[in-house]
Every structure is written in C-alpha cells, then in structure tokens.
C-alpha cells in the first residue's frame, strides 16, 4: 500500500523496544497486522485482521458514556444488567461499525483511557525512526524482529524495511507462519539472519480443519529454507492439548525437521494469555476449558523430537 506521496505503508499494531524474545540479545519487535491462519488458541487475536480494531478495557471503564456521545455512528450502547456489566463491562460496541470507523473520536473522549486502537498505517520511515532510536542496544547481538500477524503479507514494505536494516548492519529475525506465496519469502531471504516459524500440525487435512488453511505452502516454504540456510531456522510447535499434542503429530513434525536439517525445535506449552485480548476485542475465546500440558508431557514430547536427532528446547 502507498500513500499520496507514493511511500509504502503497512498496518502495524505494535513496536516493542527492549524485547528479549524471538532472536538473540535485546531487540526491537515490529508487529504487522494480518494473518491467513485462524488458530483457535491465538494469543494475539488483534493481529489477525488487516484493519485497525477497537480495544476496550472493561476494568478502566466507569460507564460515563462519554464515548457514546462522541461516536458519530451510534456504535456504542449502555449495558444495564448487573451480571452483564460484570462479564463484559458498562458498554457494548457494534464492532461492524467500529471496524469501518476512521476518526476514532471515542478515544479522545475517554479520559479513563479504556479505549485504544490496534493498528496504525506507518511508512518505512516511521518504523525506522523507532528502530534507530534503539540502535545502541543492538551492539551485543541484538537487532530487529519482524513479527505479526505475518509480515510476509506486506512484501513490498517488508523488503524496503529489511533492506534499510541491512544497510545499517542490524541483524534481523523473521517470525512468520510462512503461509504466503513463496515469492514473498524469496524477496526478503537475503536480509534474514534468523527464522522463527510454527509447524503446528503436520497433517494437511487436520491443519486445514483446525486453522482454516492447508499447510502445503507452509511446508514448501520451510523446505526452501531447509535447502538454503537450515541453520538459521528455529522450528516451533505450540503444544495445545487435544489439537497438537499427539505423539503422532510431534513425531511427524520432528521427522520433517530432521529432513530439512533444522537443528532445533522449540515446543511451547499452551497458555491463556490470549483470553484478555479476546475480551478487549469483543470476541469469544474458543478454548476456555483447555488446560496447559504437564511438565511430564512436555518432556515426553521432547524425547520424541530428540530421537530424530533434533535438539528440543521447552520454552
């Protein structure tokens, strides 16, 4: 996407400084909006859609209705039932109207700061200004991580951004689902120092049933990385009881990792950090009754992986 000046723009929902995740050292993480998968356990649901989205924090809301009076579209209504207030807060937002809004007048009207927007169109210059201000912390193996959503859904913007990072010798980590055309990946491979990709479910039919899409293109792109630079890949599998945690699935993923010569797999135990984010988006969390796997189960799955000669790290 380009603005009136012909500058590339992308929808960014967060830029985190001083991060110690998804790459070595201290990093600046840039989070892009838009994802092709719809994993029911998603911890960042605000990353899925490509448009700005309203976030409502019910604990900050006092029910003053200033937001309703400011909204020109009538998207905000009061909740009066005490039980409903306890569950979702003082106000209801018609998300079909909120998603189309471009003025967000409710934000400036809310002095309690109960409202915010996930998603802002930014130019490459905008993002680089935020990256450059952290440059001093990149000296000790730190760098820039592009994440999402999926940054590879913004290939023109991403290529320019990573080229700029490369010119300044910032090391770059890419966190991507790789569910994108292979040409999108190939365009940025010269600038990537580390890859972090989930391989959630090895069976393509089951993958489509759970996430909404087949994993054919994901596996194709992983094989490409395996052919060119396998040592740069950290393959990850979230361990979601009832979805990804079967011995058969983990064995299949580990076999694939070994085939691609990926040296390391990370397995990540299920958590419920996404529940609050779903509440703020006004969406329903799909796995309220799923519990994290036991330590014994995690170590059992790690043993299956390491039997294939792939180092396993439990995160």
From Swiss-Prot:
**Cofactor(s) listed in the protein's UniProt record:** [4Fe-4S] cluster
Q: Which UniProt keywords apply?
A: 4Fe-4S, Iron, Iron-sulfur, Metal-binding, Oxidoreductase, S-adenosyl-L-methionine
Q: Which residues bind [4Fe-4S] cluster 1?
A: 35, 39, 42
Q: 4Fe-4S ferredoxin-type domain: which residues?
A: 52-81, 89-120
What top-tier enzyme class does this entry carry? oxidoreductase
Q: Where does [4Fe-4S] cluster 3 bind?
A: 71, 98, 101, 106
A GO molecular-function descriptor: oxidoreductase activity
Q: Which reaction does it catalyse?
A: glycyl-[protein] + reduced [flavodoxin] + S-adenosyl-L-methionine = glycin-2-yl radical-[protein] + semiquinone [flavodoxin] + 5'-deoxyadenosine + L-methionine + H(+)
The entry's free-text remark on the cofactor is: Binds 3 [4Fe-4S] clusters. One cluster is coordinated with 3 cysteines and an exchangeable S-adenosyl-L-methionine.
Q: What is its EC number?
A: 1.97.1.-
Please report the stretch or stretches of sequence annotated as the Radical SAM core domain: 21-311
Q: Does the keyword Nucleotide-binding apply?
A: no
> What residues bind S-adenosyl-L-methionine, as annotated?
149, 198-200, 271
Provide the transmembrane region boundaries.
Answer: none
Question: What residues bind [4Fe-4S] cluster 2, as annotated?
Answer: 61, 64, 67, 110
Q: Which Gene3D superfamilies match?
A: Aldolase class I
Which InterPro entries does this one have? 4Fe4S_Fe-S-bd, 4Fe4S_Fe_S_CS, Aldolase_TIM, BssD/PflA/YjjW, Ind_deCO2_activ, Organic_radical-activating, Organic_radical_activase, Radical_activat_CS
As for what it does, the entry says:
Catalyzes activation of the indoleacetate decarboxylase OsIAD under anaerobic conditions by generation of an organic free radical on a glycine residue, via a homolytic cleavage of S-adenosyl-L-methionine (SAM).
Similarity annotation:
Belongs to the organic radical-activating enzymes family.
What's the protein name?
A: Indoleacetate decarboxylase activating enzyme
């Amino acid at each position: 996407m380009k603005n009136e000046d012909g500058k590339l723009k992308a929808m960014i929902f967060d830029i985190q400084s001083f991060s110690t995740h998804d790459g070595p050292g201290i990093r600046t993480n840039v989070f892009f909006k838009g994802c092709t998968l719809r994993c029911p356990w998603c911890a960042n649901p605000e990353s899925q859609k490509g448009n700005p989205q309203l976030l409502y924090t019910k604990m900050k809301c006092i029910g003053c209705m200033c937001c309703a009076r400011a909204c020109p579209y009538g998207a905000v209504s009061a909740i009066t039932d005490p039980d409903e207030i306890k569950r979702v807060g003082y106000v209801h937002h018609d998300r079909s109207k909120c998603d189309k809004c471009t003025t967000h007048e409710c934000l400036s009207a809310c002095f309690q700061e109960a409202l915010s927007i996930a998603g802002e169109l930014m130019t490459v210059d905008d993002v680089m200004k935020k990256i450059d201000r952290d440059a001093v912390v990149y000296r000790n193996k730190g760098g820039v991580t592009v994440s999402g959503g999926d940054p590879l859904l913004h290939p023109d913007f991403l290529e320019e951004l990573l080229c700029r990072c490369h010119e300044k010798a910032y090391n770059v980590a890419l966190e991507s689902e790789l569910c994108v055309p292979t040409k999108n990946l190939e365009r940025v491979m010269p600038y990537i120092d580390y890859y972090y990709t989930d391989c959630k479910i090895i069976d393509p039919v089951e993958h489509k049933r759970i996430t909404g899409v087949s994993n054919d293109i994901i596996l194709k792109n992983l094989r490409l990385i395996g052919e060119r630079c396998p040592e740069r890949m950290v393959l990850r599998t979230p361990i979601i009881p009832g979805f990804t945690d079967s011995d058969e699935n983990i064995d299949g993923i580990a076999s694939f990792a070994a085939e691609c010569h990926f040296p390391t797999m990370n397995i990540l135990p299920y958590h419920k950090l996404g529940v609050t984010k779903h509440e703020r988006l006004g969406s329903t969390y799909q796995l309220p009754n799923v519990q994290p796997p036991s330590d014994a189960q995690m170590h059992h799955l790690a043993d299956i992986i390491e039997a294939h000669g792939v180092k396993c790290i439990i995160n």
